[in-house]
């Protein structure tokens, strides 16, 4: 399949996606390496959520963030494998946040306001997967 010239806005979206996902990877690092002293400095609600969160939640968190970075890098490089990697990232986002809301007191402690960021993360993950599919169908990925 012949690769078609990608428009500038495609590259801009890919760069923004990479930056967004690098921020997510940093968030993963901060949560994964947080010492008891750091956790003690967090607001009470966040400490309760952290205490109730099982360690296995870090597996989908890692898959979501690393997959997001790799998928965004794949988009930037114009690689077709970006689409399935971004799908894997999206699925991991759904598992991560679905599990957190199912087994921790997140909803009770943060209410609707606490759901805004996870919702935005999920929607952006969905957008990136869709965007990669459109880019592949237009011949922008090889």
Give residue ranges: language-model regions.
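Topology signature of small-to-medium multi-pass alpha-helical membrane proteins
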Residues: 1-142
């Amino acid at each position: 399949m012949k690769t078609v010239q990608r428009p500038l806005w495609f590259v801009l979206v890919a760069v923004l996606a990479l930056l967004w996902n690098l921020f997510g990877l940093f968030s993963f690092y901060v949560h994964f390496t947080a010492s008891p002293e750091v956790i003690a400095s967090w607001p009470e609600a966040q400490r309760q959520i952290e205490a109730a969160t099982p360690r296995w939640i870090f597996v989908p968190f890692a898959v979501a963030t690393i997959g997001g970075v790799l998928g965004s890098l794949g988009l930037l490089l114009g690689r077709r494998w970006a689409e399935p990697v971004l799908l894997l990232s999206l699925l991991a986002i759904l598992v991560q946040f679905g599990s957190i809301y199912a087994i921790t007191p997140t909803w009770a402690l943060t209410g609707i306001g606490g759901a805004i960021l996870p919702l935005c993360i999920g929607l952006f993950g969905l957008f990136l997967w869709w965007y990669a599919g459109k880019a592949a169908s237009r011949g922008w990925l090889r």
